Amino acid sequence: MSKEKVNTRRKVVDVEKLETAKAGFANGISTYLKDLIEKGEHRSLTDKEKLKIISKAEKAYGKFLTALGVDWENDPNSMETPRRVAKAYVNDLWRGRYEIPTEITAFPSDGYNGIILERDIPITSMCSHHHQAILGKVHIAYIPGTDGKVVGLSKLNRIVEHFGRRGSIQEQLTVAIHNAISTIAETEN
């Protein structure tokens, strides 16, 4: 089969259609990313842009620690804590808020209408109510629709990773993952 024919059979999903929350909400993209998209720039934030956010968050977290009575400026164990926490949020814990998800390519199911199951997908997220870690495993099962698509197993992992790295409550995270897979695979729910 020629490459052209393969590409015409693929379905590449518009990642913006996968958004489940308003920008700036705990389980949505950041207001920074929203502003880029509104300007027509469909890209993730650059390292330089992230450094500006880290700098602002670092100052705010220092004030937060001071409000809690932590003398972080003089405690050798806490001196760098505001910067470390800010970097952890932007570059790891909430990186899904600052990044456009990678394109997910789905392929025709070619009449396959059985269940597709991926178990034990590791997830690290953060509860948006209490900012506590959510650690666990996700199990995904779906049945492609009549004219549905099949999503590669590694793509299911990417979907979980992307939405997990935003911060959310577990119920909203479940809905976001479900909606993404239903949209991409064109399931009949």
Where are the language model's segments positioned?
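A domain-level signal for the structural core that forms small-molecule/cofactor-binding pockets
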Residues: S2-N189
